[in-house]
Amino acid sequence: MGRRPARCYRYIKNKPYPKSRFCRGVPDAKIRIFDLGNKRANVDTFPACVHMMSNEREHLSSEALEAARICANKYMVKNCGKDGFHLRVRKHPFHVTRINKMLSCAGADRLQTGMRGAYGKPQGLVARVDIGDILFSMRIKEGNVKHAIEAFRRAKFKFPGRQIIVSSRKWGFTKWDREDYERMRAEGRLRSDGVGVQLQREHGPLTKWIENPI
């Protein structure tokens, strides 16, 4: 018997059901890689950022996340090179779906009890997403924004429901707008920390702060 289609588990109707000591025997998620491309690139290498956001409250299967990841990665490697972008999958499949297997052979009514004791066994993993949740993020150079948008447009076809693609006003994966980031970097208030940056806060005695307030 093949895998039950993910359309059977599309809508969020119940509570989160993660893997635990009470929920055992859960199959591994199909998606195992959540960071792709030039993930060691410094924060100043890729100033632009593009997001794929969900516009629907639903479940996304781990198979769909993996298919979309492969699709976006393949297009970006072909058009920008394997070191020309950094793609990050922002949603993880933690919710376990169950299946109550039914026999369809002759004499099945003698072997099974129908809907008596119908609590199923773990079947797969899905990610619970809401409206406005970010599914994928990609940081790139300014000249490659159009390629990132096209990669996400192709990846959208792997998902049910509606998604929107937005170009972020932030600098890369940081939390600051580009103008604020460039100003603080020029002032020497930002210290590079891999993919992100750390804000150098004002430390020292109170008398110094009173003389030169922030």
Curated annotation (Swiss-Prot):
InterPro entries the UniProt entry points to: Ribosomal_uL16 (IPR047873), Ribosomal_uL16_CS_euk_arc (IPR018255), Ribosomal_uL16_dom (IPR016180), Ribosomal_uL16_euk_arch (IPR001197), Ribosomal_uL16_sf (IPR036920)
Pfam short name (any one): Ribosomal_L16
Gene Ontology terms, MF aspect: structural constituent of ribosome
Top-level taxon: Eukaryota
Transmembrane region(s): none
Ribosomal protein found in the keyword field: yes
Entry keyword Ribonucleoprotein: yes
GO annotations of cellular component type: cytosolic large ribosomal subunit
A single GO BP: translation
Keywords per UniProt: Ribonucleoprotein, Ribosomal protein
Self-association and partners: Component of the large ribosomal subunit. Mature ribosomes consist of a small (40S) and a large (60S) subunit. The 40S subunit contains about 33 different proteins and 1 molecule of RNA (18S). The 60S subunit contains about 49 different proteins and 3 molecules of RNA (28S, 5.8S and 5S).
NCBIfam families per record: PRK04199.1-4, uL16_euk_arch
Family indicated by similarity: Belongs to the universal ribosomal protein uL16 family.
Protein name from the UniProt record: Large ribosomal subunit protein uL16
Biological source species: Caenorhabditis elegans
Species classification: Eukaryota, Metazoa, Ecdysozoa, Nematoda, Chromadorea
Encoding gene, per UniProt annotation: rpl-10L
